[in-house]
Amino acid sequence: MPITPIPILLPLPTAGLPILKSTDLVNWTLVNPAIKDVPPAEFYSAAPRHGKGVWAPCIRYHDGEYYIYWGDPDFGIYMVKASDPEGQWSEPVLVKAGKGLIDPTPLWDEDGKAYLANAWAASRAGFNSIVTISEMSADGTRVLGSPVIVFDGNDGINHTIEGPKLYRRGEYYYILAPAGGVVDGWQLALRSKNIYGPYEKKIVMAQGSAPFNGPHQGGWVTTAAGEDWFINFQDKAAYGRVLHLNPLRWVDGWPVIGEDADGDGCGQPVVKHRK
């Protein structure tokens, strides 16, 4: 008599946020995951959750610790931190609960105040194409007050702005964010002398004549040698999202990303570059 196996459902492993390290921004080594279970664990361990979970994490170093913020469009913005990125990370903290909160990036200012910029997912919030900034507690664990809209991409031009990365350079606050769509968009730079704006805007990288579509979401990195680089992705549909590394330089207070052959201040992705 044949024996029919009885299926047993076991909790699914949901470790996430893999940490990679590099000494040259080209070759990367996997270190460890920053979270053991994607929160809330009871939700994500029960079944596969396609299109949910950790969206667009942002890592920052502040006051001797590494912080990672990410948005979960169904639950809110989370944070973990560690003094050693290759060691043990803290348990996730829900910094801001809500629907549609995505792509967070923190900034600790020179006066000790902390801020959090983020975008919004229309699939959960009912709207998108805006960037908001909120003040945070100094320890980065909670948002203080209501978010302030600092840029509205519903202007018929910069729709689908998302993935903001917030920086302070000199007297200006900068937000680097892709707009125009994941596949066909461009990199937009916003700058203001006030954290809440108003912000000037400028396109600082587009596809141009390069064979790489829509240079999308990424971040600015300064090396120990003082070189500036921009890491961003290109959406290739079923092939996935391909990472690109482009040189970044500053001209008249604006970043120029990639190759700017005509000198108009808007670069395009490089096809090849010195390592």
Would you name each region that the model predicts?
Residues 1-275:
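Carbohydrate-active catalytic/glycan-binding domains of CAZyme proteins
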